[in-house]
Amino acid sequence: MNQTWRAHLQSKLQQLHKQGQYRNLYVTEQAEETWLIRDKKRMLNLASNNYLGLAGDERLKEAAIACTKRYGTGATASRLVVGNHPLYEEVERSICDWKGTERALIVNSGYTANIGAISSLASRHDIVFSDKLNHASIVDGIILSGAEHKRYRHNDLDHLEKLLKMASPEKRKLIVTDTVFSMDGDTAYLRDLVQLKEKYGAIIIVDEAHASGIYGIGGAGLSHIEKNLSQKIDIHMGTFSKALGCYGAYLTGDEIYIEYLQNMMRSFIFTTALPPSTLGAVQKAIEIVKEDNERRENLIANGEYFRTKLRDAGFDIGNSSTHIVPIVVGSNEHALRFSKRLQEAGIAAIAIRPPTVPVHSSRIRFAVTSQHTIADLKWAIDRIIHIAKEEEIFV
């Protein structure tokens, strides 16, 4: 191996170790279940994005198997070559019916959706206004676009409006936000954001990754909670990999936006399409979430119970109002030690550190699901409180 490169990479890895930011892969079994297995130890799964418990649902498995038997295991090409399987049209039509939009485009992941859409729409002639706590894929898309990047303080609409006022009138404006923030569990003020985009002649993209399947009528997303709000949003992005228990993502909105992305989005054009099995499972998942109010109600109730108990116990859970509940502890070392103790006690709870979250805000990110029982959550809360007292992490 080239010794210059070896020395450079070793130095970088040593730096990550020293900063408490080195990452490992751990084999995990039964991650689709409420209780998983890691290092031969059974743990309560409070780290998964399988919010509605659909990743292990027999109906999705059967749909995936049926599509594999009928159509094979691979897409064989990109969608623009010969990989545009008949199921794509069916699922995209289902998404439009679900979201009330004109056209949809299925892509391979939420990350490729965001980097592709933003870098295709925006250029050096434009300004993108982005919430400071938006997902990394949004940030990366803005960087790739070459657009002027204006970050507004988290959920601070006064700051956003100030930036909009200061923007050059010659430049096109794009606002982008998560709807549910993945590391904090709070939500964007969508109605106010839409008012600002209309006032200043911008367009808006919303990332519904952690809201699709959960909020709004039929689980269509946070943008569907308020009447007539979703139609004022230009592009909706959502994933199939979280509440829907599958894989992949979608972009949906007016015909012209999706037509443009289909022709310009490099992360869509230059990649092999999703396999038929995934599309079959996604179609079944959409059918289920549109009708299964009980799963959504259970998830929302479990989130409220878990948040309330942790907040009452004195933990810093920020402004969480959803099924994602962080305990912010500050340093990488505290987060890693707390995570280790929790896993030893039988709770799958993962330390989240920079650059995923801002410096000095390392945390344990808990995610409850609709499948957890109150007994499960109470059992976990008792152990979380006990370990936190021993580790002296209360604020």
Swiss-Prot record:
Matching Gene3D superfamilies? Aspartate Aminotransferase, domain 1, Type I PLP-dependent aspartate aminotransferase-like (Major domain)
Q: Which Pfam families match?
A: Aminotran_1_2
As its record notes, the protein acts as a catalyst of: 6-carboxyhexanoyl-[ACP] + L-alanine + H(+) = (8S)-8-amino-7-oxononanoate + holo-[ACP] + CO2
Annotated residues for binding of substrate? R23, H135, T356
Provide the E.C. number(s) assigned to this enzyme: 2.3.1.47
List every position bearing N6-(pyridoxal phosphate)lysine. Answer: K242
Which BP terms from GO are recorded? biotin biosynthetic process
Q: What class of enzyme is it?
A: transferase
Cofactor(s), names only, from the UniProt record: pyridoxal 5'-phosphate
Q: In which pathway does it act?
A: Cofactor biosynthesis; biotin biosynthesis
Which InterPro entries does the UniProt entry name for this protein? Aminotrans_II_pyridoxalP_BS, Aminotransferase_I/II_large, AON_synthase_class-II, AONS_Archaea/Proteobacteria, PyrdxlP-dep_Trfase, PyrdxlP-dep_Trfase_major, PyrdxlP-dep_Trfase_small
Q: Name one GO molecular function term.
A: pyridoxal phosphate binding
Residues binding pyridoxal 5'-phosphate, per UniProt:
G110, Y111, S182, D207, E208, A209, H210, T239, F240, S241, K242
Record keywords: Biotin biosynthesis, Pyridoxal phosphate, Transferase
**Functional summary from the UniProt entry:** Catalyzes the decarboxylative condensation of pimeloyl-[acyl-carrier protein] and L-alanine to produce 8-amino-7-oxononanoate (AON), [acyl-carrier protein], and carbon dioxide.
Family, similarity comment: Belongs to the class-II pyridoxal-phosphate-dependent aminotransferase family. BioF subfamily.
Q: How does it assemble?
A: Homodimer.
The name of this protein is: Putative 8-amino-7-oxononanoate synthase
What is the organism of origin for this protein?
Answer: Bacillus cereus (strain G9842)
